[in-house]
Amino acid sequence: GGIVLGKTNIPEFAAGSHTYNNLFGTTKNPWNVKLSAGGSSGGSAAALATGMAWFATGTDLGGSLRNPASWCGIVGLRPTPGLIPHGPSATSFSNLSVNGPMARNITDLSIFLDAMVDYNNRDPLSFKKSGTSYYKNLNYFSDKLFSIGCTEDFGIFPCDKEVRDMTKNTIK
């Protein structure tokens, strides 16, 4: 079991890429309080970045786990719909929003993901566990050769020369 530490801040209706609401105000980025912690799971991301928590949960419809994670320097994962069950809801068949883990690093996130993944017969999108441990498979690719593809513009999107050059230098 887990111990509930507390609740963190989210925007009203968990809608928005900036964590602000009239009741609790704005969640500031812990690395620079002039910046946003992102949203909608900005409170969770800020709590993790400051060391207040080891794990945090969130939901993701349009980046609500991923954006605050990247803005606060932590890790957030939007899992496959059905991997982490929802339980009964009015939108049971919707795969748009998912529950997901957030953590300070990939190792912690994989431990939490192992704990969150389960089957729930009240969630029509839920599926049975495969028996795979995300934590135990973290180093699966460490001794394997693999390639990473990169595109400058997907063949259709214009990209500034400065951005293109910075991307190429980063890849090198």
Regions found by a protein language model. Give the residues of each.
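Short catalytic helix/loop segments, enriched in acidic residues and glycine
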Residues: 167-171
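Short glycine/serine-rich loop segments
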Residues: 2-116
